[in-house]
Swiss-Prot record:
Keywords: Ribonucleoprotein, Ribosomal protein, RNA-binding, rRNA-binding. GO terms for molecular function: rRNA binding; structural constituent of ribosome. GO terms for biological process: translation. This is Small ribosomal subunit protein uS8.
Length: 132
């Protein structure tokens, strides 16, 4: 069965694994998912990620991050632009997530960027997801 929205599937797996206090979450690999995982790692939401060979191709393994008393580092993840309703934003009106406490993941002509990076570079694009 084909997957309609692989990004939403990734975010749901991360959200569910985070809620269940899993140490790792495994999902099918793609370059876009690896780039999203890289942004989440760089911003401090996950501790790392790696690619492993699975039975049906490559898998992306994301290592979730928790505080000293098992506090979750990801409070929320939300898909914004969906296959049925694409959401685009100019660099002048990119969204602020929780007043700047969270991040928006933007797909631009220069690759995936956070909202702060896109504003700094003066580029807009498709708003893929929010993380806080």
């Amino acid at each position: 069965m084909t997957m309609t929205d692989p990004i939403a599937d990734m975010l749901t797996r991360l959200r569910n694994g985070n809620s269940a206090y899993h140490d790792e979450v495994v999902m099918p690999h793609s370059k876009l998912k690896a780039n999203i995982a890289e942004i989440l790692k760089r911003e401090g939401y996950v501790s790392g990620y790696r690619t492993e060979q699975g039975e049906k191709g490559q898998n992306l393994v994301v290592e979730l991050k928790y505080g000293p008393n098992r506090e979750r580092s990801i409070a929320g993840l939300r898909r914004v632009s969906k296959p049925g309703l694409r959401v685009y934003a100019k660099s002048t009106n990119l969204p602020k997530v929780l007043g700047g406490l969270g991040i928006a993941i933007i797909s631009t002509s220069g690759g995936l960027l956070t909202d702060r990076q896109a504003i700094k570079q003066g580029v807009g694009g498709e708003v893929l997801a929010y993380a806080w």
